[in-house]
């Protein structure tokens, strides 16, 4: 640190008497200086020290001045007890007084409130207030200072107390110095730094100590002993340094922690005041003898560099070591002035005023940044330069070099002929390092630490400023006093070249032939003997490692990444590929690597090209180089062919084609142009009209047309090249039916594969006629049948099957399945039958039936079971070996059909809100179903639902006894929760009814006229004669029908013919009524006289032996058959192998209708109504027209 005087002035009054300067203040922009001298306020221009104007207004000595932070006004305080406010235009605008002389003034940096302090009080004035608020104090105030945020004012007192007040003047903190009244506080100042978290107050007292306190009153660090009485303490603008002046007649520079760094401008009298110019390194001081001096402080750079580690001084007392590659930094706090720094490998030497510290790295890691103290030499040294080695330090003093061990013992000394201008460690074994020394007389020496003799390398005419030696120690670069860079060959001492405008030079540590030098605002890079490459760069080059150049600009060291492109291209121009590769390894861009690789490839230096392509990870070119190397191993040495491949890869196709031709490989040129779709150029290389090559070319041209989305052109080209399959695929994919038709008709029927492809696309495009035509052309009848089936063109399929019966299964089975899917079961059945697949028909129907039951479609289930039964009957007729099993299934399915048909009504009654059935019908249905159910109910049929329906209808119709019995039976079953309440309620309420049934409801047997119970253990047969009841299939009332059987020997045909004869007999109906007329009245009388009785042979056959448990059927002979009327006989004409069933109506007046397909009996009125509703039989769903036939 040096203090350079800028200007000095001596202040006198008119009588030439010296005027003491008690205070100074800078205008915030630094252009003006306000001086308190005698009883005047002087205003100076800081640039040259000229006085702008003296301000008069005070009548006595001016003790203090202060400038507002906004630069609009300043204040002065005097021994005349007054404070004057001045504007920046140097006009006085306000004056106010205290009771005692004014000791100090200070402006609030935020609110611009002015604090003025006297011996007995302090006042606070602001422009907004008319009056000044004053506060009494117990001791004389000597100094004051506001915090940065303007919230608190610190007052320094004569009794050794620091009082910290808020903006309103109230005391918040009181700091008492140990010396008390013997240590008056003479100057205080808050640190203006914005980086510190705490406000720090510097306190200087006349106990000759400098102390630091936080706002809370807590002391920071220990008291610093000054050795003189301090009169003024002041901070630099950023708070990094403090200046203190006083009785030692000089200004001293301290760190912000109070470490003394050195003196600034020694004077002849006490220095009462000192201030730092805002945001600069200028200091002004005011003395007792009227001296006003303005100094510039120059902080020299103290630093050291070794390869990528740079150490420099910070805040005068700290050393920062920076790793230039990783940008890591470490701070070493020395707490003393750092004078010199040296760094070498893992060693760091720091010289302080009274000692030298040697540090070493904590570990061997190249990126380690942890230093620890290795040795300490407690001795004062005076030296110009300091160098550190592995086990020694070297001190340079003018012409002398001294070598000391780390213990401080002098081991060796060298005396030079001239002043030493430059010294550098150039490496070597530990304890035997070499040093490069440059002298003022131009001599350059090499010194080894363990050798007392210096070796002269060379001597030049001009003085040395900078030196560096190349990596292999063969070349030496020197910068002389004329800023010329000279490069010598150390062996021959020859000057290799020289370059102007250099202030520093450095060889590349990784490349022998590269160096860089800086000067004139430019960075110059020189490779071998090539011209210098320049780029703009401010500062000094101090190191060059690979592609990084270490540059020192003012105080900061930076690593500049410099692409080595320019020198690399210089080598490339001369086809020096290997040297260019070495340069590229130092650091070039990917584009430069690619350029190097391409140039080397074209120069057929495959080794260099391969390395370069590996760098840019270009696999295509690496494959090419690999293939060329393989071919070379096989003895292929045609460089033209290799170069042609290279040009082809680079896209230089015409050059490649010429080289292929030159090498006699026209076919390669043809392949290349073909692959590139450059068909016009390819045609030039077609041989002597080889049709194979021509066809290949057209095919590839078509492929290209296809890829560029010109498919029609491509298809036409495929056709002309004979690639029919590709043309068909392209046409089919784009739906061009016209082109497909044209191709299919042109193709020969022997070309089966393309024709089948055409047919496939016709099918896909829904042009089935053309597909059929194509299949006919190739005679593929099976495919044609499949086409008809897939498109459901059944008529054409049947016509084809008639001519070709072997395809019967191919048509009828899919047809039957299609019919079944469309609920056309009868037709499906026929189709299955035609295909001979009765088992399939049964399986499909069984599945449909099961689904209907699961989905609670019981009506459909009944219908499907009836269909199944008829299917089984059909099978039993055709296959005798299965007859018994099928007949058994027939009866089972007939029974199930009847059960589901009945349960449909019960299900609807229990699960739907409304029922279309009468109570009597539901009553009959539920009884019928209950009697028909065996122990195990069929899937889906609920016994609870059946009993619940019967119970409700019994109660409604007056069959209370039956209802009670049914409710009791329900108690033994698991009842769903939805019925539980209703059933429990019904069970209770039925007990209020009489325990008997309505006689109207009791069923009667028409054979034996026996009344039957409602709940019959035998089922739907008479308990007396065991005759099976015949029910109406709609209302399930018992019909007046009795089944009879034919005597042995009477065939069905004969029986029908005998009944049809209908022998004449008197009508019992006509004979039983008598008509009588008398006067105006007509009377009909039913007369049951004996003469009315006629004999009926069938009635006699109804009798049976009472008390027998076996059923005795009614068997009739020919005579009885002759007596029967045809309209009284109903015949169920079952197909074989079943026998016909005969029924005789005992009440001819009751009209009964039987469905001719399912043979279910109905009351005629019910049947007609149901047929009108559904247009079919309600049981078997045969359309009415079909039924009537």
Swiss-Prot record:
Coiled coil: none
Database matches in Pfam families: Beta-prop_IFT122_1st, Beta-prop_IFT122_2nd, TPR_IFT122, Zn_ribbon_IFT122, Zn_ribbon_IFT122_C
WD repeat intervals: 16-54, 57-97, 99-135, 137-175, 180-223, 225-264, 266-306, 459-498
Keyword Cell wall biogenesis/degradation: no
Keywords: Cell projection, Cilium, Cilium biogenesis/degradation, Cytoplasm, Cytoskeleton, Developmental protein, Repeat, WD repeat
Any GO BP: intraciliary retrograde transport
Any one cellular-component term (Gene Ontology): intraciliary transport particle A
Xref: InterPro entries: Beta-prop_IFT122_1st, Beta-prop_IFT122_2nd, Ift122/121, TPR-like_helical_dom_sf, WD40/YVTN_repeat-like_dom_sf, WD40_repeat_dom_sf, WD40_rpt, Zn_ribbon_IFT122
Annotated compartments: Cell projection, Cilium; Cytoplasm, Cytoskeleton, Cilium basal body
Keyword Repeat: yes
Subunit-structure text: Component of the IFT complex A (IFT-A) complex.
PANTHER family the record matches: INTRAFLAGELLAR TRANSPORT PROTEIN 122 HOMOLOG (PTHR12764:SF4), WD REPEAT DOMAIN-RELATED (PTHR12764)
Function of the protein: Required for cilia formation during embryonal development. Acts as a negative regulator of Shh signaling.
Protein name, per record: Intraflagellar transport protein 122 homolog
Organism: Xenopus tropicalis
Gene designation: ift122
């Amino acid at each position: 640190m040096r203090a350079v005087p800028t200007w000095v002035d001596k202040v006198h009054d008119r009588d030439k008497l010296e005027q003491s300067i008690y205070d100074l203040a800078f205008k915030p922009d630094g252009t003006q200086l306000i001086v308190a001298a005698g009883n005047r306020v002087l205003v100076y221009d800081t640039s040259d020290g000229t006085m702008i104007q003296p301000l008069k207004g005070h009548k006595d000595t001016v003790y203090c001045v202060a400038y507002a932070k906004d630069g609009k006004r300043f204040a002065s305080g005097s021994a005349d007890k007054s404070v004057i406010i001045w504007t920046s235009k140097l006009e006085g605008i306000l004056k106010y007084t205290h009771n005692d002389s004014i000791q100090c003034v200070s402006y609030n940096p935020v609110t611009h409130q002015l604090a003025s302090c006297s011996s007995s009080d302090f006042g606070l004035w602001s422009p907004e207030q008319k009056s000044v608020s004053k506060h009494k104090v117990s001791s004389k105030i000597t100094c004051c200072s506001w915090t940065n945020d303007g919230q608190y004012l610190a007052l320094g007192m004569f009794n050794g107390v620091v009082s910290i007040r808020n903006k309103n003047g109230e005391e918040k903190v009181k700091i008492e110095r140990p010396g008390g009244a013997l240590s008056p506080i003479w100057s205080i100042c808050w640190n203006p730094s914005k980086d510190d978290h705490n406000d720090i107050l510097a306190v200087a007292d006349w106990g000759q100590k400098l102390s630091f306190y936080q706002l809370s009153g807590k002391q920071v660090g220990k008291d610093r002993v000054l050795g003189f009485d301090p009169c003024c303490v002041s901070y630099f603008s950023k708070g990094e340094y403090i200046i203190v002046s006083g009785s030692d007649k000089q200004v001293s520079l301290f760190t912000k922690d109070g470490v003394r760094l050195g003196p600034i401008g020694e004077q002849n009298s006490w220095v009462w005041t000192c201030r730092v110019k805002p945001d600069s390194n200028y200091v002004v001081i005011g003395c007792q003898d009227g001296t006003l001096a303005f100094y510039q402080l120059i902080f020299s750079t103290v630093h050291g560099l070794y390869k990528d580690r740079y150490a420099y001084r910070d805040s005068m007392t700290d050393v920062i070591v920076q790793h230039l590659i990783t940008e890591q930094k470490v701070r070493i706090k020395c707490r003393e002035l750092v004078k010199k720094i040296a760094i070498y490998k893992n060693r760091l030497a720091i010289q302080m005023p009274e000692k030298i510290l040697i540090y070493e790295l904590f570990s061997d890691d190249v990126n380690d940044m942890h230093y620890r103290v290795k040795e300490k030499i407690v001795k004062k040294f005076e030296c110009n330069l300091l160098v550190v080695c592995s086990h020694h330090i070297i001190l340079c003093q003018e012409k002398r070099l001294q070598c000391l061990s780390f213990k401080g013992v002098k081991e060796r000394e060298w005396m030079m002929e001239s002043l030493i201008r430059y010294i550098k460690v150039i490496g070597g074994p530990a304890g035997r390092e070499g040093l490069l020394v440059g002298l003022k007389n131009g001599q350059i020496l090499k010194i080894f630490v363990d050798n007392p003799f210096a070796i002269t390398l060379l001597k030049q005419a001009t003085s040395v400023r900078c030196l560096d030696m190349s990596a292999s120690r063969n070349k030496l670069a020197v910068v002389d006093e004329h800023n010329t860079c000279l490069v010598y060959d150390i062996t021959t001492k020859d000057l290799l070249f020289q370059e102007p405008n250099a202030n520093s030079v450095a060889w590349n540590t990784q490349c022998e032939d590269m160096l860089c030098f800086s000067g004139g605002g430019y960075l110059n890079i020189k490779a071998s003997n090539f011209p210098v490459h320049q780029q703009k760069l401010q500062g000094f080059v101090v190191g060059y490692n690979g592609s990084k150049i270490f540059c020192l600009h003012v105080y900061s060291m930076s690593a500049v990444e410099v692409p080595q492109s320019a020198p690399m291209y210089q080598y490339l121009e001369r086809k020096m590929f290997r040297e260019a590769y070495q340069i590229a390894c130092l650091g070039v861009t990917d584009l430069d690597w690619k350029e190097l690789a391409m140039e080397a490839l074209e120069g057929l230096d495959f080794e260099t090209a391969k390395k370069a392509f590996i760098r840019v990870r270009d696999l295509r070119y690496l494959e090419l180089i690999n293939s060329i190397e393989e071919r070379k191993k096989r003895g292929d040495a045609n460089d033209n062919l290799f170069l042609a491949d290279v040009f082809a890869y680079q896209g230089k196709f015409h050059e490649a084609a010429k080289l292929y031709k030159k090498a006699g490989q026209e076919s390669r040129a043809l392949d290349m142009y073909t692959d590139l779709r450059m068909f016009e150029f390819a045609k030039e290389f077609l041989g002597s009209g080889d049709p194979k090559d021509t066809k290949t070319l057209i095919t590839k041209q078509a492929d290209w047309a296809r890829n560029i989305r010109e498919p029609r052109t491509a298809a036409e080209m495929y056709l002309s090249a004979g690639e029919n399959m590709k043309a068909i695929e392209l046409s089919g994919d784009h739906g061009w039916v016209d082109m497909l038709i044209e191709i299919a008709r042109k193709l020969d029927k022997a070309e089966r594969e393309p024709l089948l492809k055409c047919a496939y696309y016709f099918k896909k495009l829904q042009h089935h006629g053309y597909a059929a035509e194509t299949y006919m052309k190739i005679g593929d009848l099976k495919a044609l049948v499949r086409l008809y089936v897939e498109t459901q063109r059944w008529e054409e399929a049947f016509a084809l099957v008639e001519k070709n019966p072997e395809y019967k299964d191919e048509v009828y089975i899919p047809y039957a399945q299609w019919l079944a899917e469309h609920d056309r079961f009868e037709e499906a059945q026929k189709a299955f039958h035609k295909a001979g697949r009765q088992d399939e028909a049964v399986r499909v129907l069984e599945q449909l039936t099961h689904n209907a039951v699961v989905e609670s479609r019981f009506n459909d289930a009944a219908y499907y079971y009836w269909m199944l039964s008829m299917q089984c009957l059909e099978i039993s007729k055709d296959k005798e070996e299965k007859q018994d099993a099928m007949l058994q299934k027939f009866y089972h399915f007939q029974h199930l059909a009847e059960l589901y048909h009945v349960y449909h009504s019960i299900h609807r009654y229990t699960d739907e809100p409304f029922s279309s059935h009468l109570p009597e019908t539901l009553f009959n249905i539920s009884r019928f179903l209950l009697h028909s159910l065996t122990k195990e109910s069929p899937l889906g049929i609920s016994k609870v639902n059946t009993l619940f329906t019967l119970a409700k209808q019994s109660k409604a119709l007056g069959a209370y006894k039956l209802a009670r019995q049914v409710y009791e039976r329900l108690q033994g079953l698991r009842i769903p929760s939805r019925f539980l309440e209703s059933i429990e309620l019904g069970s209770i309420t039925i007990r209020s009814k009489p325990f008997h049934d309505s006689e109207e409801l009791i069923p009667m047997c028409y054979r034996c006229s026996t009344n039957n119970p409602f709940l019959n253990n035998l089922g739907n047969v008479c308990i007396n004669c065991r005759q099976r009841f015949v029910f109406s299939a709609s209302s399930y009332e018992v019909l007046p029908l009795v089944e009879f059987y034919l005597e042995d020997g009477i065939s069905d045909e004969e029986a029908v013919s005998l009944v049809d004869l209908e022998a004449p007999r008197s009508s019992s109906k006509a004979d039983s009524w008598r008509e009588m007329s008398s006067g105006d009245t007509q009377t009909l009388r039913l007369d049951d006289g004996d003469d009315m009785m006629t004999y009926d042979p069938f009635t006699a056959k109804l009798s049976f032996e009472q008390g027998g448990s076996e059923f005795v059927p009614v068997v009739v002979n020919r005579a009885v058959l002759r007596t029967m009327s045809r309209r009284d006989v109903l015949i169920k004409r079952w197909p074989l192998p079943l026998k016909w069933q005969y029924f005789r109506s005992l009440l001819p007046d009751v009209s009964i209708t039987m469905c001719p397909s399912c043979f279910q009996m109905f009351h005629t009125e019910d049947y007609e109504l149901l047929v009108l509703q559904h247009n079919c039989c309600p049981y078997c769903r045969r359309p009415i027209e079909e039924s009537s036939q």
